[in-house]
């Protein structure tokens, strides 16, 4: 099962979700189980994206490919520990020029 996580609704959305208890358990160090956390970025500035990628990298999360996700869904393969999916909406040129180097820097 995919767990969408994004910040639609403004910059305070993550804090509001945190206070309301709507964040997936892995955010607090809990087990993901059979869920795959999906981070959806929409029109994300590099200054906002970098700390999120740094957090994931520093805490040993790894990204999965579309083929791996298909294997989890189609074949029932186990989702590895600390696996996350990163999804980027609106393929602006800056995703390639700014986001690409950040993803590479943090091992994604």
Residue ranges and their predicted role:
Residues 1-86, 93-108:
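Terminal accessory/targeting
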């Amino acid at each position: 099962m995919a767990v969408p996580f994004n910040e639609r609704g403004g910059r305070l959305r993550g804090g509001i979700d945190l206070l309301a208890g709507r964040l997936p358990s892995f955010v607090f160090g809990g087990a993901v189980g059979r869920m795959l956390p999906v981070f959806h970025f929409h029109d994300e500035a590099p200054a906002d994206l970098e700390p999120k990628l740094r957090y994931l990298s520093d805490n040993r999360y790894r990204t999965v490919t579309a083929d791996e996700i298909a294997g989890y869904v189609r074949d029932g393969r186990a989702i590895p520990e600390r696996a996350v999916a990163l999804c980027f909406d609106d393929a602006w040129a800056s995703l390639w020029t700014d986001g690409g180097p950040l993803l590479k820097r943090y091992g994604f």
